UniProtKB/Swiss-Prot annotation:
It catalyses: tRNA(Thr) + L-threonine + ATP = L-threonyl-tRNA(Thr) + AMP + diphosphate + H(+). It comes from Dictyostelium discoideum (Social amoeba). The gene is thrS1. It comes from the Eukaryota. Keywords: Aminoacyl-tRNA synthetase, ATP-binding, Cytoplasm, Ligase, Nucleotide-binding, Protein biosynthesis. One of its GO terms (biological process) is threonyl-tRNA aminoacylation. InterPro entries: aa-tRNA-synt_IIb, aa-tRNA-synth_II, aa-tRNA-synth_II/BPL/LPL, Anticodon-bd, Anticodon-bd_dom_sf, Beta-grasp_dom_sf, TGS, TGS-like. This is Probable threonine--tRNA ligase 1, cytoplasmic.
């Protein structure tokens, strides 16, 4: 719930809490009956509760329209991003009207708006006061969120018509939208997609308007008395607050909005997949059916999306990981990857790379325990806020937990003896194994796991050192991401309303971060009030070759842990001999597992030589060349590179083809000619024939490529 002030409608979120996804429904509940196929929309039955819900809505809408008749027209001023001020009328002029006054083309291209830089607003909803107004097209973050949220309502209406179950939540996501429904023993299957799409398309063609009302809590409870999931959400709203509802066609839903003006804006709609889920993400709660979808303002974008998804499927790290024998998962240890020899090579290389940079950049590597008493987590504050995500074990009549993060342990290390200002900045780095109790349904390959390692570091420094340390962190991050070929964006998140600490300290810290970002010289965005309660932060989003955004690196200031652990250092200030340090939380790879998944998909499994688990393979023409081939393989291996040999009886063309499919960087063919010249015939996985090279020259080339991270 966002806005709970008296006399203001509660902007009820469509998604109250993430709902854990489980196995695909068709796999988990094969024996349960699928929905009866009805073929066309006209044969579908409208549930009785829908009729009652609409009757209540129409009554409330009539009262609302009647109340507007007595409302006096009051002028308002609407300020656009370019500074232009447009006159409007309170509770009458809409963002669409403002856009239409500029040009009809602009009006037809926007799907959402933002009022006063914060609240996303329907373009068909009248403005209520003087404001700053930003008009948002589909390609903006606000535009996509609004567009896909509206599409979720279309999906929800279609599911009500087809299945007649109880809708739960239906949010927009970063990749489209979904809706959950309680359906008893019924399940959704891939065979249903065609019918869902047909019904959704009919809803689009009907050009159903999205209408909004703010109603008293008691009326909302009456309207949704048939749906225990909606009433559970409503019951959490304070009695004196109003509830925001939206209607399109036969669907009335709890929703904070905003939405597009009508369903015809959704030009292209498709169901993409389905699964089962738990209500409120808890395994002890009811089973739900989840249907995912995607939509766009035109069919061309849908075609581009489908092409993108085909390419993404080819690069999916789970498929590549299996094909290249890098890792696997087992139900005996959900969310914990088994890294096979070739996957371990990549994993270790990433860690070694960061470790070498630590040595160059003044970080001190430490090793901390994996299990701590509950008392530590109570002192750090994590027990109160994070215990449900921790693995807790009873030990010696006390509760212990596997650590989900390293920072409290590093605080104990800093506080283990008296510290001097001469030791600062003190940079602790830790590759310790972390465990977080993620919901089973949320586990996804290497990107969402329970056991992982981070390139985690905590910098203990003075307030005066913040700017230089942040600059150093940004430079470190830029160097690493440059090697991987990632573009990145920066965002500064400042003091939230629930901040802890002194405002003066926050002001100094935020100014230091801003100076560091400006000095760094890359564009950055401001996210007001989006920092953590314990300090401001810089969020870094990388972009892969498919233009997908991932957040891996974090740079976070922390004023609270030094207070909680009573950390001090001996200062050189005679007026204040003891001072508290500031902590900078810093990671670049983030989770090594997640970064490995991103790199697999970024490279498509075609690893650059420096990090490749299969750098070279010697391929013999026939068995008479095997002895020389083994000699070459050993020389390359002894030089520190991964080299295999295929001295089987297969044909040379088949050996080469299999080596290319296995993504060996270099394929070294040896026959009698190579034996005579003490050389190898070099070709690449992309079938580029390089010709003959001596083994020493080849090893020198390998060393240079590794040195250049190629």
């Amino acid at each position: 719930m966002s806005d709970s002030q008296e006399n203001k409608p509660v902007e009820t979120p469509t998604e109250v809490k993430p709902v854990a996804e489980k196995k695909p429904a068709a796999e988990k509940k094969e024996k349960k009956p699928a929905v009866k196929k009805v073929g066309v929309m006209e044969t579908l039955q409208t549930p009785d509760y829908v009729k009652e819900r609409i009757e209540i809505w129409e009554s409330l809408k009539a009262k609302h329209l009647e109340s507007l008749k007595d409302m006096k027209e009051e002028p308002i001023n609407v300020t656009l991003p370019d500074g232009k001020v447009v006159a409007g009328i309170k509770n009458k002029t809409t963002p669409y009207d403002i856009a239409k006054g500029i040009s009809r083309g602009l009006a037809d291209s926007i799907v959402s708006s933002k009022v006063n830089g914060e609240q996303i607003w329907d373009i068909s909803r009248p403005l209520e006061a003087d404001c700053n107004l930003q008009l948002c097209k589909f390609d903006s973050e606000e535009g996509k969120k609004t567009f896909w949220h509206s599409s979720a309502h279309i999906l929800g209406q279609a599911m009500e018509r087809i299945y007649g179950g109880q809708l739960c939540i239906g949010p927009a996501t970063s990749e489209g939208f979904y809706y959950d429904m309680a359906m008893g023993d019924k399940i959704v299957s891939a065979e249903d997609y065609k019918l869902i799409n047909e019904v959704a398309q009919k809803i689009v063609q009907e050009k159903q308007p999205f209408e909004r009302l703010a109603v008293p809590r008691d009326i909302a409870l009456t309207m949704f008395k048939f749906n225990k999931y909606k009433t559970e959400i409503i019951s959490k709203i304070p009695q004196e607050d109003t509830v925001s509802l939206y209607r399109c066609g036969t669907l009335v839903d709890l929703c904070r909005g905003p939405h597009v003006p009508n369903t015809s804006y959704i030009k292209s709609f498709a169901v993409t997949k389905n699964s089962s889920a738990y209500w409120l993400g808890k395994a002890e709660n009811d089973d739900l059916q989840r249907v995912y979808g995607i939509s766009f303002p035109d069919k061309k974008q849908m075609e581009e999306y489908e092409n993108f998804m085909r390419e993404a499927a080819l690069r999916d790290h789970r498929n590549v990981g299996k094909a290249q024998e890098l890792f696997f998962f087992h139900p005996y240890s959900p969310g914990s990857a088994f890294f096979l020899p070739h996957g371990t090579r990549i994993y270790n290389k990433l860690v070694e790379f960061i470790r070498e940079e630590y040595h160059r950049r003044g970080f001190t590597e430490v090793i901390s325990p994996s299990i701590f008493s509950q008392k530590l987590w109570e002192q750090s504050g994590h027990w109160q806020k994070y215990s449900e995500n921790m693995f807790v074990l009873p030990v010696d009549k006390d509760n212990f937990s596997l650590k989900p993060m390293n920072c409290p342990g590093h605080c104990l290390m800093f506080g283990s003896r008296q510290r001097s200002y001469r030791e600062l900045p003190l940079r602790f780095a830790d590759f310790g194994v972390l465990h977080r109790n993620e919901l089973a349904g949320a586990l996804t390959g290497l990107t969402r796991v329970r056991k992982f390692q981070q390139d985690d570091a905590h910098i203990f420094c003075t307030t005066e050192m913040i700017e230089d340390e942040i600059n150093s962190c940004l430079g470190f991050m830029q160097y690493v991401y440059g090697i991987f070929g990632f573009e990145f964006g920066l965002e500064l998140s400042t003091r939230p309303d629930n901040f802890l600490g002194e405002i003066a300290q926050w002001d100094i810290a935020e100014a230091s971060l801003e100076k560091a970002l400006n000095k760094f010289g890359k564009p950055w965005k401001l996210n007001p009030k989006d920092g953590a309660f314990y300090g401001p932060k810089i969020d870094i989003h990388i972009t892969d070759c498919l233009k997908r955004s991932h957040q891996c690196a974090t740079i976070q200031l922390d004023f609270q842990l030094p207070i909680r652990f009573d950390l001090e250092y001996q200062s050189d200030d005679a007026a204040e001999l003891k001072k508290r340090p500031v902590i900078i939380h810093r990671a670049i790879l983030g989770s090594v597992e997640r970064m490995m998944a991103i790199l697999i998909e970024h490279t498509g499994g075609k690893w650059p030589l420096w990090v490749s688990p299969r750098q070279a393979i010697v391929v013999t023409v026939n068995k008479t060349h095997n002895e020389y081939g083994q000699k070459v393989c050993k020389e390359i291996s002894d030089a520190g590179f991964y080299c295999d040999i295929d001295d089987s009886d297969k044909t040379i063309s088949k050996k080469v083809r299999e080596a290319q499919l296995a993504q060996y960087n270099y394929i070294l063919v040896v026959g009698q000619e190579e034996i005579n010249g003490n050389t190898v015939n070099v070709r690449t996985r992309d079938n580029v024939v390089r010709g003959s090279l001596t083994v020493n020259d080849l090893i020198s080339e390998f060393k240079q490529l590794v040195k250049e991270f190629k």
